[in-house]
């Protein structure tokens, strides 16, 4: 495991953020991550890409990533510089796609307690999220080591290529 902590500013979104809100279908004529990144979350917050900085963290309500099974959604988030997504629950297919693309996501039932603009730190190894703004510490079930290895490698394809190369 390489990167144990993720530190960033929080951007809040509500529940049931579907993949079309993450990256609208009108932009799916490309699969170039940098192009997708320009439009991430555009229909939920048209100014999101302009406001956020690389390394920031999305904290959302339940059922994040519902809707279609498009892999473009986690690709766009990651390419835009979103360091992680925290929500009480994730749509099943988005959950798997996020790890396959190397985007860390964490299930936290108390995510509603974290406000937009808060500075937080996610300790992936110990399963804690520390809200540096409010000094509250939250526990989550750490992701399995294999899933952390996918994140460390930058996604499933990179992980597989590294395995083939013997790294």
Swiss-Prot record:
A Pfam family per the record: Aconitase_C
GO molecular function, one term: 3-isopropylmalate dehydratase activity
EC id: 4.2.1.33
Keyword Disulfide bond tagged: no
Reaction(s) this enzyme catalyzes, per UniProt: (2R,3S)-3-isopropylmalate = (2S)-2-isopropylmalate
Highest taxon of source: Bacteria
GO terms classed as biological process: L-leucine biosynthetic process
Sorted UniProt keywords: Amino-acid biosynthesis, Branched-chain amino acid biosynthesis, Leucine biosynthesis, Lyase
Pathway: Amino-acid biosynthesis; L-leucine biosynthesis; L-leucine from 3-methyl-2-oxobutanoate: step 2/4
Enzyme class: lyase
InterPro entries reported in the protein's UniProt record: Aconitase/3IPM_dehydase_swvl, AconitaseA/IPMdHydase_ssu_swvl, IPMI_Swivel, LeuD, LeuD_type2/HacB/DmdB
Membrane keyword on record: no
Subunit-structure text: Heterodimer of LeuC and LeuD.
Role according to the record: Catalyzes the isomerization between 2-isopropylmalate and 3-isopropylmalate, via the formation of 2-isopropylmaleate.
Family statement: Belongs to the LeuD family. LeuD type 2 subfamily.
Protein name: 3-isopropylmalate dehydratase small subunit
Organism: Sulfurimonas denitrificans (strain ATCC 33889 / DSM 1251) (Thiomicrospira denitrificans (strain ATCC 33889 / DSM 1251))
């Amino acid at each position: 495991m390489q990167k144990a902590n993720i530190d960033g500013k929080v951007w809040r979104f509500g529940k049931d953020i579907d993949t079309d809100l993450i990256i609208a279908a009108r932009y799916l004529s490309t699969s170039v991550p940098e192009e997708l990144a320009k439009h991430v979350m555009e229909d939920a917050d048209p100014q999101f890409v302009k406001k956020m900085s690389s390394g920031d963290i999305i904290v959302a309500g339940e059922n994040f990533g519902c809707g279609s099974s498009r892999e473009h959604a986690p690709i766009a988030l990651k390419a835009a510089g979103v360091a992680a997504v925290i929500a009480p629950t994730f749509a099943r297919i988005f959950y798997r796609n996020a790890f396959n693309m190397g985007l860390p996501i964490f299930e936290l039932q108390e995510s509603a307690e974290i406000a937009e603009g808060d500075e937080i730190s996610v300790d992936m190894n110990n399963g804690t999220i520390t809200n540096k703004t409010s000094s509250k510490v939250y526990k989550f079930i750490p992701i399995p080591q294999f899933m952390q290895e996918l994140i460390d490698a930058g996604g499933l394809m990179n992980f597989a290529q590294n395995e083939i190369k013997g790294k």
